[in-house]
């Protein structure tokens, strides 16, 4: 993983996030809160473990993992998922599986920004973060 991912990132733009949350099955009240949130993402590494902490007024979440090893994750919308993060062509690709469903989250560095694509049932959400 490139050390360029490491650091603190602030959301600057978001497209189709409400549609993505609908595809995940998130209820209206939580979607409204999610749409208002402007999260900060902190990515750090200690040894073989990568930690991604997401902080917002809505909720804070944190995952720690080794690349290529499945782990249990409780998502911001309280889904209990089995997740795995791999390095794919310079991007961090995360796959969450729960209740027979699956979503993919791809984090890519582009022009000094972190572009996060979230894909579920044909819905593609793009969220762009700038380093703080």
Swiss-Prot record:
What's the protein called, per UniProt? Myelin P2 protein
The main location class comes to cytoplasm
PANTHER family, from UniProt? FATTY ACID BINDING PROTEIN
The subunit field of the Swiss-Prot or TrEMBL record says:
Monomer.
Name a biological process GO annotation: membrane organization
Offer an example of a GO molecular function term for this protein. Answer: fatty acid binding
Residues that coordinate or bind hexadecanoate? 107, 127-129
**Native species of this protein?**
Mus musculus (Mouse)
Which family is this sequence assigned to? Belongs to the calycin superfamily. Fatty-acid binding protein (FABP) family.
What taxonomic lineage is listed for the species of origin?
Answer: Eukaryota, Metazoa, Chordata, Craniata, Vertebrata
Write down a Pfam family by its short name. Lipocalin
Residues bound to (9Z)-octadecenoate are 107, 127-129
Chain positions with N-acetylserine modification = 2
Q: What does the UniProt entry say about where the protein is found?
A: Cytoplasm
The domain of life is: Eukaryota
* Miscellaneous remark of the record: P2 protein and myelin basic protein together constitute a major fraction of peripheral nervous system myelin protein.
Q: State the protein's purpose.
A: May play a role in lipid transport protein in Schwann cells. May bind cholesterol.
* InterPro entries listed in its UniProt record: Calycin, Fatty_acid-bd, ILBP, Lipocln_cytosolic_FA-bd_dom, Myelin_P2
Q: Which UniProt keywords apply?
A: Acetylation, Cytoplasm, Lipid-binding, Transport
